[in-house]
């Protein structure tokens, strides 16, 4: 069989195209990097990979907003080079100190000794100096602006979304908000825009990102959202976050999700039943609790911690009114995975007022595990109308029926 000939340099051309910049608007480009195989970030699973977004503005002053994780220097530089020689960059804006955003500041600075670097003051200046030494940073605050030619960029500090140095950059000329961590998702895709991807999956990843990264700072996130709204109803038609896809067709959807679901603390009538089990007894109790919710007309999800990562639990937890956490007793303590969940949950500081908790579990000679779960849930602010639900050794069918009925009555009465 005769092989079809390929154009000379075909593979090189394809690779060059893959590592080319993506135009967002005239003279504004995405030049970031894709970490396809990343599966963990700060303790939570990133099954869809990670995108480190950086943005290039071609104006009288060539401006780069954020960089990428240091190991992606070549990818970043190749994408920039598809538009302009990286040594021609005049201004670098660091919206966030964290190394997945700032890791290539030394790379860019090394190419241009006259580079001007702007970041938040004082936290950004302190953080970047600690990481990379004194590169002559220019600290900016909310209300400060920077003229780069026909564009004037405005800065708004968004502290603790999710570090003290965070800020966003607004390009009024193009109506683009470079939002840094706000409105982001850990989601690697060859398609850059929201409308080029499965919107349901993008929104799911945005929710998971909020639940596991931004949730402890929901009041700060709400303030950042308010600042965006204050720009005016027609001021932003594109949101370019530091991770994930760029919002252009569904800007209103992600703003509404942050406002009405993520930061509001509004709870839905749904339940999650999370547990670990040693020999199956606590698992049987978990199923009875789940059945009790279903009998009361409450949607419920059963989550065995052997098969579900704690970061996925927190995604479902975000707006669940009912949370059941179960563990047998192991060495007078809850099972390690349950203890890890409770520790992780405590760190994310969810708003638990109005949330109903059901601590439960089996035991042999002392119910120390379930009682420890109950204590931690009570300290976290859960209401515990059933106190702690326990069963010694293997629960009988009669005991399982009692548990199911108790949960049904409780959920039906609320």
Question: How would you describe each model-predicted region?
Answer:
Residues 21-81, 168-171, 175-178, 282:
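Conserved beta-strand hairpin/beta-sheet module of binuclear metal-dependent hydrolase folds
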Residues 22-26, 118-166, 220-226:
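Metallo-beta-lactamase
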Residues 28, 177-196:
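Short, solvent-exposed beta-strand-terminating loops
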Residues 60, 71-118:
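Active-site metal-binding motif and surrounding structural segment of the metallo-beta-lactamase
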Residues 65-67, 89-97, 116-121, 177-180, ...:
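Active-site neighborhood of phospho(di)ester-bond hydrolases with catalytic His/Asp-centered motifs
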Residues 189-192, 200-239, 244-246, 288-305, ...:
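FMN-binding flavodoxin-like domain, especially the glycine-rich phosphate-binding loop
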Residues 238-267, 340-341:
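Short N-terminal or domain-adjacent regulatory/targeting segments
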Residues 274-295:
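Short, charged N-terminal beta->alpha structural module
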């Amino acid at each position: 069989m005769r092989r079809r000939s390929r154009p000379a340099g075909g593979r090189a051309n394809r690779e060059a195209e893959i590592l080319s910049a993506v135009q967002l608007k005239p003279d504004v480009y995405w030049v970031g990097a894709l970490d396809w195989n990343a599966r963990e970030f700060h303790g939570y699973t990133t099954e869809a990979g990670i995108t480190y977004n950086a943005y290039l503005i071609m104006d009288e002053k060539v401006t780069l907003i954020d960089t990428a994780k240091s190991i992606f220097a070549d990818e970043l530089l190749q994408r920039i080079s598809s538009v302009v020689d990286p040594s021609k960059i005049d201004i670098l804006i660091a919206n966030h100190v964290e190394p997945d955003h700032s890791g290539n500041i030394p790379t860019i600075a090394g190419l241009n000794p006259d580079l001007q670097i702007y970041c938040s003051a004082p936290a950004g200046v302190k953080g970047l100096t600690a990481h990379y030494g004194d590169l002559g940073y220019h600290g900016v605050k909310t209300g400060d602006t920077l003229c780069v030619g026909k564009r004037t960029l405005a800065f708004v500090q968004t502290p603790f979304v999710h570090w003290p140095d965070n800020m966003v950059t607004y390009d009024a000329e193009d109506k683009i908000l470079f939002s840094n961590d706000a409105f982001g998702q850990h989601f690697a895709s060859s398609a850059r825009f929201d409308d080029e991807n499965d919107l349901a999956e993008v929104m799911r990843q945005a929710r998971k990102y909020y639940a596991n990264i931004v949730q402890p700072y929901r009041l700060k996130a709400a303030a950042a959202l308010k600042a965006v709204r204050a720009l005016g109803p027609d001021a932003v038609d594109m949101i370019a976050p530091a991770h994930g896809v760029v919002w252009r067709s569904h800007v209103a959807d992600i703003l509404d999700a942050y406002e009405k679901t993520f930061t509001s603390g509004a709870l839905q009538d749904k339940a999650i039943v999370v547990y670990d089990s040693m020999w199956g007894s606590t698992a049987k109790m978990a199923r009875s609790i789940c059945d009790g919710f279903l009998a009361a007309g409450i949607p419920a999800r059963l989550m065995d911690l052997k098969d579900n990562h704690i970061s996925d639990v927190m995604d479902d937890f975000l707006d669940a009114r009912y949370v059941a956490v179960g563990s047998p007793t192991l060495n007078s303590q809850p099972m390690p995975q349950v203890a890890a969940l409770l520790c992780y949950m405590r760190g994310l500081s969810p708003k638990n007022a109005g949330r109903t908790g059901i601590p439960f579990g089996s035991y042999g000679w002392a119910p120390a595990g379930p009682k420890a779960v109950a204590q931690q849930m009570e300290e976290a602010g859960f209401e515990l109308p059933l106190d702690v639900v326990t069963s010694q050794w293997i629960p009988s069918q009669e005991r399982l029926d009692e548990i199911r009925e108790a949960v049904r009555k409780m959920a039906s009465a609320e």
